[in-house]
Amino acid sequence: MRVRGALQAAALLASALWASPLLAKDHPDFKTTKLDTQPNNLNYFQGSDTILFHDPHKANLWRSDDAGATWSVVKDIPDGKVARLYMHDFDPKRAFAITDGRKHYRTTDQGKTWKKFEINAEWDTERYDILHFHATDPDRIIFNGLNCLGFLCEEVSLYTIDGFDTPAKPLRPDTLGCWWAKSNALFTTGDSDLDKDRILCIIMGVDSIFTEDRRLVISDDFFKADKEGNIQEFEPNLAGDKPVRGVVNVAAVKRYFMVATTSANTDEMALFISTDTKKWQRAMFPNAHDDHDHKIVQEAYTVLESTNYSIQLNVMTGSKSQPMGIMFTSNYDGTYFTENLEYTNLNMYGHVDFEKIAGIQGIFLVNKVDNGKDVDEKPSTKKKLVSEITFDDGRTFEKVTADGKRIHLHSVTELNNVGRVFSSPAPGLVMANGNTGDYLEDYWDANLYVSDDAGKTWKKALKGPHKYEFGDQGSILVAVRDSKEEDVSEISYSLDHGENWVEEKLPDDLKIQPWILTTTPDSTTLQFVLIGKAKGAWQVIHIDFEALHEATCKDSDMEEWHARVDKDGESTCIMGHTQTFPRRKKDAKCFLKKEFKLAEVETKDCDCTDQDYECDYSFERNDKGNCVSKGPIPIPEGACKDGDKNGKFMGTSGYRKIPGNTCKDTKDTKDKYKDVERSCGDGIGAPPEEATGELQQVDTKGKFGHWTQWEKHYLERGESSSDSSETIIMRGKNRTVDDSGPKAGPIWRTTDHGKTWEKIDFFKDEEVISIVPHPTVKDWVFFLTEGKKLIYTPDRGKRFRTFDVPQPADLEAAANGIFPLIFHPDKPNWLIWLGKKCESKNDCYRVAYGTKDGERWETLARDVYRCEFTGAEAYGRKYANRALEQILCLKHEKEGASDSALQLVSSNDWFNKDEKVRLKDAKEFATMAEFIVVATEDTEKKTLRAHASLDGGLYSEAKFPFGFEVPHQHAYTVLDSSTHAVNLFVATKMEGDKSLGTILKSNSNGTSYVVSVKNVNCDQYFYVDFEKMVGLEGVALVNVVANPDAKSSAPQKLQTKITHNDGAQWAYLPTPSKDEFGRFPCSSSGTEKCALHIQGYTQRRDRGKTYSSEGAVGVMFGWGNVGDSLGPLKDADTFMTTDAGITWKRVKKGRWNWALGDQGSIIVMVPIRGQKTDTLEYSLDQGATWKKHTFSKEKVDIWDLTTTRSGNSQNFLIWGENSDGLFTTKIDFTKFTDHVCKYDPENLGKSDYQIFSPKHPLQPDGCLFGHVSQYLRKKPGLKCFNDFRLDPLYSKQNCTCTRSDFECDFNYELDNHGQCALVKGLKPQDPKLWCKEHPDEIEYYEPTGYRRIPLTTCQGGADFEKQAAVHPCPGHEDDFERKHRISGIAIFFAVVLPVAAASAIGWWVYRNWDGKFGQIRLGEQGASTMEFFDADRPWVKYPVIALSAVVALAGAMPLVLAAIWRTAKNTAQRFGVGGGGRGGWSRLDGGGASRTFRTRDSFARGRGDYTIVDEDEGELLGEESDEEV
């Protein structure tokens, strides 16, 4: 078997030139070449006898120009330099030898000569498409590589239009791969100029390294920049009218361009198709069946060998350990797919048992899993594979038979050769290894079978499995027995289509273990190459059958072979036409000897019949064979535009002609399959019902029973989700102190946001102690039991699967925050399980196990405290040593000694061979964005030390600022940080619930810190009064202790402060204006004596709630009061802001719960729990006006008000209790809208959106962190709704750099004039450290006292870091001298011209000055050379320090997945209080548990807000608040 083409497992070999036979022989000629190492990546130059292969061990290239008879090492390339060989995809004379450096080699004459060329980048060992070729111009090539500085790497793309005759040029920054639009000869944009130049690139998101923010851009002039520096490019509207984020892959398939996208919260991918790169459409798949899904998930789809007229796709279903799939075929446009076959067989690499019969249209072989449903339900079930064949491109399938018996064939998933698996261009000739019987058996029990009618009938050829090839267009078949040993001494060949076989001994009594048997890709020659292993060496055996026959075939030796015939032998139709090939007769004694020329096919179209049609999109065949509707159907463009659901359009009959079928329409088929009249209401994207303004509600009462709390989990959708459902999984629970009474009720599921609820019967006999949604892929939910069984759903509760973990969970550790199940941020199947293993009753320890599929578990480490995945695709691309598989563990130094000190160990290979101790005396660690922060203990001083790492390997100790004295550091809390710096809270005063501390801000590598804000309030568990405004950069609230030095008996005086520039300055909140509820006790713009103060995180009962929503940018709510300090919680009112905290208003007297929907255009409020009500209030204009709605006939106690965390839904859910027990009420606002909002940048008056740009009250230019951000906000009062895939961030424009973009450097602090001055008694940090940390840099600057804020994106302007003297780095003095050498012309421009200009200006001033020296006019400001540094200027008065904000939706990586256990809210012993819909937690223990980490909001986008690292005793936290939810 062989895999040629798509799999690219190895390239193909060629054969020798024909020569006129001088003398007939009765055996082939052999020539043998012995090699020390295994040949790799053998490639023929198309249409020739020239072969190349790569020797990876000695890093050389070998070449043969006589079909493998003789070989020599390529001499033009230095010995030992070749790392990879690439053949040009479209030029049969070109190849490229890539080295490990930046100097590479190319040939344009089939390897005779090689020329060196240089690329200003290194090759990326992890990607295959390093070189991307233009389909029609062989000189146009894109190089996708890397630029690395130490362990920091960035991807780059360069291009050449002259085949590297001149140096390649970079395309644009931040690329993740680029492709020519003309990547396939069949593809065209419809414009020859665009075909020539158009390039598509995947680029990084704006200030983001995360996959879900990546974008696709297109350029037609190589991404050139204009005079202002703007790159000439555009984002294509993949979604029809708007671009789509999260682009992960681009592929050119025949006449189609395919783009795959992903998004947060789901592993589903969206597939967009274009036939010209101008107009794009999302690929549509039919509705899912009951037993399998139709969505495309990450790493779970394979583009099969498609045709010129459709795309064939296999979508994986089932588990990774036992993968299966569904095969689909698209329509002509590639947008609507129909199902061909379910339960196709594939392996864990995505290879599918599928192959087309070469050269014949519509025929392919597949293997399917006959017991697929059983395997899907229980992945440990062994697959039973059967083989089938289709002759109508997948519309129908038949059994494969030999002599009347069914046979099954080994296919692509069991490769044992190179090239195509079954067939070759030899017309109708097919070979395969297989067996008779019910199912496919072991490969080594197979026999060789042959078919000469394109797979219709088969016959047994040779006993045992073989490697095989075709020659001379099928005139000769060659096979060699496959073996596990070096015991093969002969080959077999047949000259009559496999009827008879001749054995031929290998020369010199040679015995080999065969590796590959191959010939030219077109199978037109008589020369073959056999490679095998013998006695520790590799034998390359050239086999030449040229002289077996003297004759060259004549016309009388040829026959017309029809691809398909009827019972009378007459040609019948395949795909609407007959196919006839000229072929040598089976018994003819001759060879064709037509080297590199394929047989020409003759086709003739047939009249259409029913067999030429298949079910169209959204239709399936019923039991009678008719195509019936299974879902909405496509509406033609331009139809149903008037919004009338009862309107009509001409739509599909339910049938379509099979794509690629060329049959001629007849009158009968035209009438039978013509379009029919359809109702607009039945179509995809049917017009919605007219907006009536009616508020709908659905009550669910009396079915949930009596419980003391809810446990509920919203399963958020991703932007790439095709499913529009709003799924919630929930159950009632009792918060019991002892074991009396039931702990939890049945598990319920809704897919329509609470309109209907179904009880999940799967759990009828299961005792689930914890429900845990996957933190980054919300389609997956895990259900933990007390034993070894773990239950999960990969599709939001549609199906459930189980697997066993190696050991039960350590429930005691789980109650203390060590969650047993750890997830990988990118790979939902990758899990770590912390199990409790006991040698005896009193001898138990924790073991970490790892799996990639839930079926096979391996021991990672013993005696561990906890482990975490720290590898991620986003960070692995940036930090070379941070592998995707990287795992960190806290592990006891001595196995078996649980009282021994912990050490931080890491592994980049699941602890197979790589295990390194990184830090000793480790106490805890946390991951936050790209940073890994670790606390270690100084055992002598009994204090903690903080360390940080970017790559998981190198850890540097944190340097705290001078004057920040904490004699004994006992607790750190990692706050929600930006993606470029660490926010670290350090407790400075620990007095129970009167504790406080300082927030410190790091530099870009997490090691050097400056003070951001002091005296920040925290509680005894080191939760901090810190609240970030979700979705905005740099806006955060803190509560500070105004009387930090007061006696412990005195009450704390808390005051709220806000930052709009990431901690550069903090200000009090302004008081609202007088409102309908009366006056406030004072009024001001925000002063120490009078301001608005908001209750902080430590006062919050439900710590899963947030004050803002990621979808409603700039909107925030809070409970608080006006005065000189924060008052009691019971006296608080409800306030809100719509402009990111610049102004506030009171919306309700007293405390109300709120929820935001439709990206903030809908606000719903209800009284808090304990205040019975029958009414809710809502606003459709961001709180300007409010309306009431009575939702209940009786007053009820509302426990919670929820909607989706993203804030994109128009539905809300009230959770409460009435006389019948627990109830839910769905509040539905969909009747208020009837179409999707549109943004029209050309006509803002007609646009449904207005632009909101966050401002800083003291920075009028609007620049925050070096840029101006603009967000879309729906105009009030419109009857449109926001698409849930809408990205609120509309644009971001960089500003020039000013003082605001720099903060004080290490050992510098702000003086009284607002300047960064050196701290008295200290020295600046040694600037030579810059050279040490950046070995490729040639120079360093003396310290200026300033450093660039990590978050800023400013460009140009002032650079405060580089305004002092510059010096060469050690070892780079010559480079420095060359860079700074001054020429004579430079001296002229630098000295002579300025002096002359100064003289001229002085003369002009003397003549025109209208005042005298010393005169100052009223109303004028005196000029000063230091005016820029004037202390009153905002950029001087408020230097940016940058706190903890993140770009909208960036969040932070999961900090400590121990927190997920707390998210579960329950253990077998005790259950806590239910959480909220905006990220509410479930946890194992209701109270009394000592916990190591604190983290909240850790499941938003898979990243958390903050985590405590450690406290004095090694367990940071004390008793947990009973009020925590």
Curated annotation (Swiss-Prot):
One of its GO terms (biological process) is protein targeting to vacuole. This is Vacuolar protein sorting/targeting protein 10. InterPro entries: Sortilin_C, Sortilin_N, VPS10, VPS10-sortilin, WD40/YVTN_repeat-like_dom_sf. It is a multi-pass membrane protein. The gene is vps10. BNR repeats lie at residues 62-72, 105-116, 449-460, 493-502, 748-759, 1135-1145, 1178-1188. Keywords: Glycoprotein, Golgi apparatus, Membrane, Protein transport, Receptor, Repeat, Signal, Transmembrane, Transmembrane helix, Transport. It is found in: Golgi apparatus, trans-Golgi network membrane; Prevacuolar compartment membrane. The lineage of its organism: Eukaryota, Fungi, Dikarya, Ascomycota, Pezizomycotina. Its main location: Golgi. Glycans are attached at residues 308, 734, 1005, 1294. Functions as a sorting receptor in the Golgi compartment required for the intracellular sorting and delivery of soluble vacuolar proteins, like carboxypeptidase Y (CPY) and proteinase A. Executes multiple rounds of sorting by cycling between the late Golgi and a prevacuolar endosome-like compartment.
